[in-house]
């Protein structure tokens, strides 16, 4: 089986661009429009459906097929049925694809219109060849072969108190200089803001999260069958990383923005601590689908991504395929920003003179880590991409206290963990507070506000610290 993300060439950069940062007004050059629409994007699902691939387009129904493509589908369907040994005299089953009629399945696909891409899985080489013949002029076929992962906590963590009253933790954990205690005292706690998390999941029954309704989706490696679509279930997290991230940003007892509406897509496997471009794309599509519902379409949103590509192409992956994956990921990050969603991204834990993606993309608000004494963490990644320094901003990311998944005795568990994975949700929470106070500001204006209000940090000889420590003012 071969898997590809099909992205219209007109919507993807010819190379990962450095962007306009580095000038005073450079940030505002980035697009402020709503989600981009490319007419050619519909061609991919139409063609794949005509070739007999199974549709797994969320929420499980086949996409509409245009009149021209419908005629082509019927012609190709009859030909394909003949080559697969179907009885030409047998009338087709209503609404059934060639694969369902013959028992053969040449592949499956997931159309993601909000990010303008289609994930295709080919089980037969000749079907892939046909698809390329139809689509390669207009689409990049990006092989889904480069693993993404979260930077991982730097330490295993220190246990905290279990099942203890947590009402005052926010004031104890977040220093006065962060502005969090003052914001909470003023009633600014994130209400009305949507916060998306792409991670390992969330323990929805943990005391930090049990009192709220969490929109949760487990994103599988392969698309769900349209006859057995993904179920909406209570959030779970077999690893704990996602639960810790959610607790920092939005825990009801000690989160930075405890009243946000939480949307969690589980895209990282706990066993391998890996994900793929296709799963991240499906997670972003699900988030944008939730954010664009009629009741949500005018509400502000923030997305936290404590994940990234390896710094170099992994063994067995060509530099060309690696760069294609980068370009596709940048296109997806840009979709968030174009949809007025602020993407907050962990810079990574590989130390100075290292810059990873998506943190290095100009569309991302890249976050490094400091401790509670404002000292830069030795593990915090930093570097330069073109004229742009990374990270953009710093957040508390050393020994940060938050929730983890419950243990087998069903006791709630808390730990202190370190990493830019912890610093990013702190900044995402700060962004949610700003968007709560001023919901009419655009995502770019909120980013400008975070950068302009940052607390300056002492110059470091080894690390870049961006504009300083993110705070709420």
What spans do the regions from the language model cover?
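Structural recognition of the beta-strand scaffold that forms the well-ordered cores
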Residues: 5, 119, 194-197, 247, ...
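Substrate-binding/access-modulating region of protease and related hydrolase catalytic domains
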Residues: 252, 268-363, 373, 408-424, ...
């Amino acid at each position: 089986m071969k898997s590809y993300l099909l992205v219209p060439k007109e919507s993807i950069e010819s190379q990962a661009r450095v962007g306009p940062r580095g000038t005073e007004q450079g940030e505002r050059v980035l697009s402020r429009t709503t989600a981009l629409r490319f007419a050619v994007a519909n061609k991919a699902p139409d063609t794949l459906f005509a070739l007999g691939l199974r549709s797994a387009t969320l929420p499980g129904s086949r996409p509409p097929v245009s009149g021209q493509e419908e005629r082509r589908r019927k012609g190709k369907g009859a030909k394909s049925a003949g080559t697969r040994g179907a009885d030409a005299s047998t009338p087709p089953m209503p609404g059934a694809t060639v694969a369902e009629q013959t028992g053969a399945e040449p592949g499956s696909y997931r159309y993601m219109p909000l990010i303008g891409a289609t994930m295709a899985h080919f089980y037969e080489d000749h079907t892939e060849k046909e698809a390329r013949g139809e689509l390669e002029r207009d689409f990049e076929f990006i092989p889904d072969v480069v693993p993404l992962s979260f930077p991982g906590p730097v330490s295993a963590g220190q246990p905290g108190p279990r099942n203890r009253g947590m009402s005052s933790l926010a004031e104890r954990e977040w220093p006065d200089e962060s502005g969090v205690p003052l914001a909470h005292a003023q009633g600014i706690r994130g209400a009305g803001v949507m916060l998306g998390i792409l991670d390992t999941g969330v323990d929805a029954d943990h005391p930090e999260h049990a009192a709220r309704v969490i929109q949760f989706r487990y994103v599988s490696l392969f698309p769900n069958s349209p006859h057995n679509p993904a179920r909406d279930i209570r959030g779970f997290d077999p690893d704990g990383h996602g639960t810790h991230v959610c607790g920092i940003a939005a825990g009801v007892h000690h989160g930075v923005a405890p009243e946000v509406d939480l949307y969690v897509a589980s895209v990282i496997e706990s066993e391998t601590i890996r994900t793929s471009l296709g799963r991240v794309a499906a997670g972003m599509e699900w988030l944008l689908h939730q954010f664009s519902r009629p009741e949500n379409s005018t509400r502000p949103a923030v997305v936290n991504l404590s994940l990234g590509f390896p710094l170099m192409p992994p063994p067995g992956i060509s530099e060309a395929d690696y760069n294609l994956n980068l370009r596709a990921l940048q296109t997806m990050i840009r979709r968030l920003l174009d949809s007025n969603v602020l993407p907050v991204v962990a810079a990574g834990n590989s130390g100075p003179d290292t810059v990873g993606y998506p943190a290095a993309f100009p569309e991302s608000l890249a976050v490094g880590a400091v401790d509670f004494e404002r000292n830069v963490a030795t593990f915090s990644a930093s570097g330069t991409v073109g004229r742009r320094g990374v990270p953009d901003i710093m957040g508390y990311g050393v020994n940060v206290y938050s929730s983890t998944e419950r243990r087998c005795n069903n006791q709630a568990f808390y730990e202190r963990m370190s990493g830019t994975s912890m610093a990013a949700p702190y900044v995402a929470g700060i962004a949610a507070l700003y968007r709560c106070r001023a919901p009419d500001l655009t995502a770019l204006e909120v980013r400008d506000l975070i950068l302009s209000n940052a607390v300056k940090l002492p110059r470091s000889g080894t690390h870049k610290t961006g504009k300083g420590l993110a705070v709420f003012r």
